[in-house]
Amino acid sequence: IDLLEKYNYIGLKHLLRKRNILDFDLLFTEFPEHILPYDYDTYFASPERFVMVTTNCMTGEANYFEEKRDKSRVIDIVRASSSLPFVCPVTYVDDVPMLDGGIVDSIPLQRAIADGYTRNVVVLTRNRGYRKDTKDIRIPSFVYRKYPKLREALSRRCAVYNKQLEMVEQMEDEGKIIVIRPQKPVMVDRIERDVQKL
């Protein structure tokens, strides 16, 4: 947030110039290499798991990645995981077209449980009771025309997210997970530029 005003890495000018609302070169090259050097050696040496989720554009399903050896592959996965539909380009990981994992698995709690984790903490950006509007969303055939499964996933996204929220609230009520979330509705855009709001 502190760097948003100085570096201006979000906005329509990026979308118009590079077909990406985010300045990925700045975010994933300049920041980790020069501005805020990322300690890849410590990351690679850590025994902790770090799982990144993307949406496979060919299958319309979630892909989960762990990478602890190849720096450029880490960047590819992070770029894909950050590639928001409609405003960011498709990003390739291992020659497979990918977008943000939030399309199909916004809250990967089920995956954590399947991986054997029993003490989970879920961090949400919306207050309890929040639900997305689930009116029928039809993605026109010219949008992502090469990826019909992705279009299907995008049309189901809100319903899937709401179902995940229901599961989170139920498990929270049962004392099975800890949830960190705002107490009141948050009035910020998904890609917010106003530093005061953030």
What are these language model-derived features?
Residues 2-198:
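Patatin-like phospholipase
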